[in-house]
């Protein structure tokens, strides 16, 4: 089946198998920030933006992205690097495996609500799993970033 997908601003036309998952499509195109974790839509590691909304790419067929814009962390380098520095500064990068999903979802939250409360942050990021940091570093990084951005 032929699909037309805009990936990180680049228009692509690809022949794909009907059962190809979006996570496999973006990884095949070299977007390795998108991680395979639980494969049941429970961990947030595979988060990408579809038309600027966060979706879990492990549970969406690539065919559903036909005609849509998909953005991965690679497509948000400037924005992600700025924010990622605050995550790292707060010790949330023990292994770093979960960071792309956290960063994608945090950026989605900031777009939806530029000044979220701590409780709203916790609620929004509840679907992101981290196996080693206990979430406090990510939360501190987000709060530090928001304070910096507000005073910028």
Which functions belong to the PLM regions below?
Residues 1-152:
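Signature of N-terminal electron-transfer/Fe-S-associated modules in redox systems
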């Amino acid at each position: 089946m032929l699909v037309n997908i805009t990936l990180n601003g680049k228009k692509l036309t690809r022949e794909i198998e009907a059962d190809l998952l979006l996570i496999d499509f973006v990884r095949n195109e070299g977007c390795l920030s998108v991680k395979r974790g639980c494969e049941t839509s429970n961990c947030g590691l595979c988060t990408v933006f579809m038309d600027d909304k966060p979706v879990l790419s492990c549970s969406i067929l690539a065919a559903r992205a036909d005609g849509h814009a998909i953005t991965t962390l690679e497509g948000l380098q400037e924005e992600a690097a700025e924010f990622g520095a605050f995550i790292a500064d707060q010790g949330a990068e023990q292994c770093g495996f979960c960071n792309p999903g956290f960063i994608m979802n945090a950026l989605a939250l900031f777009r939806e609500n530029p000044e979220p409360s701590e409780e709203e942050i916790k609620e929004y990021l509840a679907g992101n799993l981290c196996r080693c940091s206990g979430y406090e570093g990510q939360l501190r990084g987000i709060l530090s970033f928001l304070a910096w951005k507000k005073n910028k």
